[in-house]
A protein has these predicted regions:
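Alpha-helical transmembrane segments and their membrane-interface exit regions
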Residues: 177, 196-207, 260-273
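N-terminal transmembrane-helix/juxtamembrane module of multi-pass inner/ER membrane proteins
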Residues: 1-76, 120, 130, 268-289
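Alpha-helical transmembrane segments
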Residues: 23-34, 172-175, 233-239
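Membrane-interfacial, low-structure loops and terminal tails that flank and connect transmembrane helices
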Residues: 1-18, 211-229
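Membrane-embedded alpha-helical segments of multi-pass membrane proteins
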Residues: 68-76, 145-150, 193-197
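Membrane-interface loops
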Residues: 39-58, 83-167, 171, 177-178, ...
Length: 290
């Protein structure tokens, strides 16, 4: 195990890390169920809730046992908070969780979508897990997939800490979790890229180390930088408008949300945030999210 789990350099007593993680979990878990349930309730009160389904999705098989990896993200959600070497690490991971949950719930409320596939009856452990899931989850709260957003965050958190055989096993299990949102018929395809975008945004907003991209922001007085900021901001607005309007005709237009966010971040950099938004380290490498 020593060769498979990267050593964690403790910078403070681990007991403090556990307490901090427990406090965050005591807040995040109820917040999730309350806000997620509220969004579900609002959607259920609508006369009609739309859906985005590609024709080829009807060929996706229902694989009952994949509810197990689907559910496993709940375990890793809590364990990840404990897998930190200081309170700052806990705070940053919690910040990513909170970002994903808040943004996703806002989207669920403003743009509710519903899953259209009806699952067949299941028995045994899968049947039990589906029954528990159905006890609080409804066929709404689709895009962006909060499950995928949290998976991106949790996958990134563990991949920096595992070594040896555990690392490819982790990648494989993470793939199963990601695929399970389709094979359990919990989500439609478009929920995945939108959820991944949200997850990477949360990673960027709260990086593992270094300054936060929004810390110390001051509007620049440089005329050229302001002009460039406006130029990139305009590009972001146009891409966002293209995604919103294009989605009325073809859901593929929602992929424009990726360049829209990228352009917005560059505009933010020129406006005063500076080069730290690119999260480049001393050796020239950059974070996955940036």
């Amino acid at each position: 195990m020593a060769s498979s789990l990267a050593p964690i350099a403790r910078t403070e007593p681990y007991g403090r890390v556990v307490v901090r993680a427990a406090l965050w979990l005591a807040f995040l878990a109820p917040f999730f169920y309350l806000s997620y349930g509220f969004a579900n309730w609002l959607a259920s009160r609508r006369d009609e809730v739309g859906s985005i389904v590609f024709s080829w999705e009807h060929s996706i098989p229902f694989v009952a046992w994949t509810i197990v990896p689907y559910w496993s993200i709940n375990l890793f959600y809590g364990l990840s908070l404990l897998l930190n070497n200081d309170k700052q690490g806990v705070d940053r991971l919690a910040g990513r969780y909170l970002t994903a949950q808040v943004v996703a719930v806002i989207c669920f409320i403003l743009f509710p979508l519903t899953a259209t596939f009806v699952r067949p009856a299941t028995t045994g452990l899968p049947g039990f897990l589906f029954a528990v899931l159905g006890g609080f989850d409804k066929p709404f709260n689709q895009a962006p997939s909060l499950h995928i957003a949290l998976l991106v965050i949790i996958w990134d958190h563990w991949r920096h800490r595992l070594r040896g055989l555990l690392l490819p096993l982790w990648h494989g299990w993470s793939f199963l979790i990601g695929a399970s949102v389709l094979t359990t018929w919990q989500h439609h395809f478009i929920d995945i890229p939108t959820g991944a975008l949200l997850g990477f945004f949360a990673l960027w907003l709260f990086p593992r180390s270094g300054a936060l991209p929004f810390s110390g922001f001051r509007l620049t007085s440089d005329v050229k930088a302001r002009r460039l900021a406006r130029f990139y901001a305009l590009g972001a607005v146009l891409a966002l408008a293209g995604a919103a309007l294009g989605a009325l005709f073809c859901a593929v237009a929602l992929f424009l949300l990726w360049p829209a966010l990228a352009l917005a971040i560059v505009a933010f950099a020129y406006a005063g945030a500076g080069e730290k938004v690119f999260q480049k380290s001393a050796d020239g490498s950059i974070t996955l999210a940036s």
